[in-house]
Amino acid sequence: MTMIKIAQQAKQASFELAQFGNVQKNQALFSIADALEQRTEEILVVNAKDIDYAKSQGISEAIIDRLLLTPERIRGIANDVRNVASLADPVGQVIDGGVLDSGLKIERQRVPLGVILTIYEARPNVTIDVASLCLKTGNAVILRGGKETKFTNAILVEVVQSALEQAGLPKLAVQAVTDPDRALLLELLKLDQFIDMVIPRGGAGLHQFCKENSTIPVIVGGIGVCHLYVEASADLERSLNVIANAKTQRPSTCNTLETLLVDKAIADQFLPKLAEHLCKLKVTLHSDDFSEDLQKNPQIQPLEQAKLRQEWLSLDLSVVVVDGIQQAIEHIRTYGSQHSEGILTSNYALARQFVQQVDAAAVYINASTRFTDGAQFGLGAEVAVSTQKLHARGPMGLEALTTYKWVCEGDYLTRK
């Protein structure tokens, strides 16, 4: 099937989907969750094909683990769909409004965006996560996963489409492009007459490719070169726990700490404690600021400047000593990705200065960067984390998958 045909079908499905209310959409979501559990064995057999292919291509164990589905993981994905069904539906919500002096009654109402194209890599759970969030908000979605998940994505979308059909919703509201040919992706990125938003979920290369080639608005995000600045007045013992959480809880995520900035005034006192604490947790520290004795530790390596602009996505941490808060802010402006940045301090005035001067989707005072997440922010599930400023910023929950329209009503009213 051609890309233009898929996009046309998605657009038509979005018109049909917009007519369904919250009850019907929730029924469809519950049907999807049930179908995932009922067809677990079938899904696992197909998933094994993707795992075998990944192993034959020498793909890393970390990526293979992301690809792998188990009965427990499928059950978790199904429960996530049920959780989406339990969330409040933003569609139809009146944001604000009133009656104007002219007598015109005006309301600003939330409505679906229309058609969303999501491009992602080796995460089959994203197929269901994004589909459920789009369906909840009345959007059609085109899913373009990586070649590593080709077979798994195909069966997951087939499960979703069957459940939609049984629930009386348009099954073509969820479609997949399983051919990894990049020329097809280029074609999709030009179909702005049918597709309303592109959400890439992957590395910096994928985001740059979409920005350079798309005529459709692209949500940029998910690249997390996140910093914590240990200011001179910080409680150093408690800071160690926050740093360890931000770095080690789940190193491969975009909200993980990648560079630690330490105030020069406390460096001699704090760096030995930091090394002792994090080396026990198997973290490798990359820095030129540790003492000669500490640098003998094989877990303390020289710092490569180029790494300051990259996500480690592993148990590695850059450590840089800075001369005060202004230098810390300048470092973040130079190397940060506008994702999540934090300060550890007991000085309220410096905390406010940090918040005002650091440009990021989420700014933290005395807390781990790991909280930048839709569920943690109380938004429910998230479709992505945006680091841009237009339309959406930070974790993108259901509201970020809507736009609004002005609804105006008069009594055969004319403008004077």
Curated annotation (Swiss-Prot):
PROSITE patterns to which the protein is assigned, alphabetical: PROA
GO biological process: L-proline biosynthetic process
Metabolic or biological pathway, per its Swiss-Prot or TrEMBL entry: Amino-acid biosynthesis; L-proline biosynthesis; L-glutamate 5-semialdehyde from L-glutamate: step 2/2
Domain of life: Bacteria
InterPro entries: Ald_DH/histidinol_DH, Ald_DH_C, Ald_DH_N, Aldehyde_DH_dom, G-glutamylP_reductase_CS, Glu-5-SA_DH, GPR_dom
Cell compartments where the protein resides: Cytoplasm
This enzyme's EC code(s): 1.2.1.41
Gene3D superfamilies in the record: Aldehyde Dehydrogenase, Chain A, domain 1, Aldehyde Dehydrogenase, Chain A, domain 2
Molecular function terms, GO-annotated: glutamate-5-semialdehyde dehydrogenase activity; NADP binding
Pfam family, one: Aldedh
Keywords of the record: Amino-acid biosynthesis, Cytoplasm, NADP, Oxidoreductase, Proline biosynthesis
Main location: cytoplasm
A single Gene Ontology CC term: cytoplasm
Top EC category: oxidoreductase
Function: Catalyzes the NADPH-dependent reduction of L-glutamate 5-phosphate into L-glutamate 5-semialdehyde and phosphate. The product spontaneously undergoes cyclization to form 1-pyrroline-5-carboxylate.
PANTHER family xrefs: DELTA-1-PYRROLINE-5-CARBOXYLATE SYNTHASE, GLUTAMATE SEMIALDEHYDE DEHYDROGENASE
Protein family per UniProt: Belongs to the gamma-glutamyl phosphate reductase family.
HAMAP family registered for this protein in UniProt: ProA
Name by which UniProt lists this protein: Gamma-glutamyl phosphate reductase
Organism: Glaesserella parasuis serovar 5 (strain SH0165) (Haemophilus parasuis)
Name of the gene this protein is made from: proA
